[in-house]
Amino acid sequence: GCTSVIDHHASPAYIGGSLSTLRDAFLKVGLRAMTCFETTDRNNGIKELQEGVEENIRFARQIDEAKKAATEPYLVEAHIGAHAPFTVPDAGLEMLREAVKATGRGLHIHAAEDLYDVSHSHHWYGKDLLARLAQFDLIDNKTLVAHGLYLPKDDITLLNQRDAFLVHNARSNMNNHVGYNHHLSDIRNLALGTDGIGSDMFEEMKFAFFKHRDAGGPLWPDSFAKALTNGNELMSRNFGAKFGLLEAGYKADLTICDYNSPTPLLADNIAGHIAFGMGSGSVHSVMVNGVMVYEDRQFNFDCDSIYAQARKAAASMWRRMDALA
């Protein structure tokens, strides 16, 4: 049921060229996407960090050239990626600032997923986490901050003032046992994400709503349906196009559901239907950029060969993991 993927990629043993590999895959299946490389120093120090920044810049320039050539559908965009700030020293933030400035793209970063990220910023830099990023001009209306569970009040105010986005990843937070974000109702631009825990956004909205209620939160399904559809605004800001409505001038990206509703399905109650009834099993077809990429519950490419390759790669990975032990 997804028409677009916003990706935060990491492959420390394969940095240069990795984003182009992802772009090839997105174009093959016809998905719209925005991707970046997760810049960090946690595996190989400043060298790894510099290589990550360079890959982000290289890929953004590749996208610019592809747009000018206009020989392929404009389905893939670039962000400038960074891992949690506790693995990006000030020298790295300066590199990221230059990358954002040089490419005109926004920052995609995971922040305050754990309390350590915040305390590290206070201990080593004497600043709130997002205030530190803002010092390097890294918080603006194209910025995507994932998680943000432990952002202090001043950082939330800064996020809202700069018109940036916070992406809430309920299932990932539960899986990693990092806690709960009790400040969702304070966020101006809230969207939902998976952080790689599946790709089912129907399911993600259900978990986001029910976990919120379990934590004593005040929001109802309509707030989470709004967060679900806010992904369209994220895409609009970065693609320079309009998404999310069946109107002239909007991109023809849509999901068609075959949902036999037991009660009236109306604009006023569709959020409740998504929370309590409708799911990805209801998806009949998906259109991206006016092209059917999933029709009558069938993909238009060979899934079997992709799955076979994935199983082979998974087995190889586990053999390498066993060798480490």
Residues of each region from the PLM?
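C-terminal active-site-proximal or functional interface alpha/beta core segments in diverse enzymes
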Residues: V145-K153, V167-G179
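Active-site microenvironment of metallo-dependent hydrolases
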Residues: L228-A325
